[in-house]
Amino acid sequence: MMLLPRQALLLLLALAAALPAAAQAPVPQGLGSLAPLSPLDNGPDHLKRYNECMTLARSEPLKALPVAEKWHGEGGGLAARHCVAVAMFEAGRYGQAAAQFEAIARDMGSDRPGLRAELWGQAGQAFIEAGAADKAAEAQSRAIELKGNDPDLWIDRGLSYAAMRAWPRAISDFDRALILRPNNVEILVLRAAAWRNARNPTRALDDAAHALRIAPDHSEALLERGFASLVLGERNQANNDFNKVLRLVPPDSTAARRAQAGLRGEQPVPPPAETQPPPPVAPKGKQ
């Protein structure tokens, strides 16, 4: 369930200093399309109208909002409400979009747990855009309760915890994602960044080295290994990695700027936490 491109989600977190510079990606063009949400009318006309509404929501969200709201008034049900939510998201009304995604998930009752998990996941992504990482993590926890075998949900919640600088929780979620998706370079790099921010350069080095055994020219993994080596006093190894990054990436890229900072001996400094993580709670029943 990857509703936003992973690189785009990193950008949304505004963690370029704390997490890999892969964050510098284009702003996402839209949330992933779901099947029509209304359990009352799944006929071909309903599906056609839903798809048309979603296309408009992504391309011209301000035009799509009144169209979707009118459709809802005509009995479009949950599918129309979902189109409203996506249009709100694309129009930058992230808090309202998150509330709408949550409301749709709740109003579905106990039906279609996989679809409800996607809706909670979309709510989490909208909360991240709204700068509410704590609410994002809560929504993502609801999604995980419904679909705990989806590694993307664990990654998303790990990124929300990273936005709160709750590094042990972020690492734990990346651990779980790696169990579900072994040897994934992207997750290894994310966990390396989390270990680095948790002041454990040895574990960061291990994850970065593992990623580089799979993808030797992965610029973010090279940066993570370089910064971990820098902390551990291995300046020659660090410089080798930073120089390799400069050969691989455009000179005006964020990765290049980070590599240049590393060559000067500078370590990335994470930004302030967006919000404080909620205290751990016992697992709830399915919502």
Positions of PLM-derived features:
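N-terminal leader/linker segments that initiate helical-solenoid repeat arrays
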Residues: A22-C83, G92-A99, P272-Q287
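Helix-start (N-cap) detector for alpha-helical repeat units in TPR-like alpha-solenoids
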Residues: H46, L78-A79, R112, A117, ...
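Residue-level recognition of tetratricopeptide repeat
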Residues: E52-M54, V86, Q125, L159, ...
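Structural signature of tandem alpha-helical TPR/SEL1-like repeats
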Residues: E60-K63, R93-Q100, A130-A139, M164-R176, ...
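Canonical positions in the second alpha-helix
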Residues: K70-W71, A103-I104, R142-A143, R176-A177, ...
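Canonical tetratricopeptide repeat
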Residues: C83, Q122, D156, L190, ...
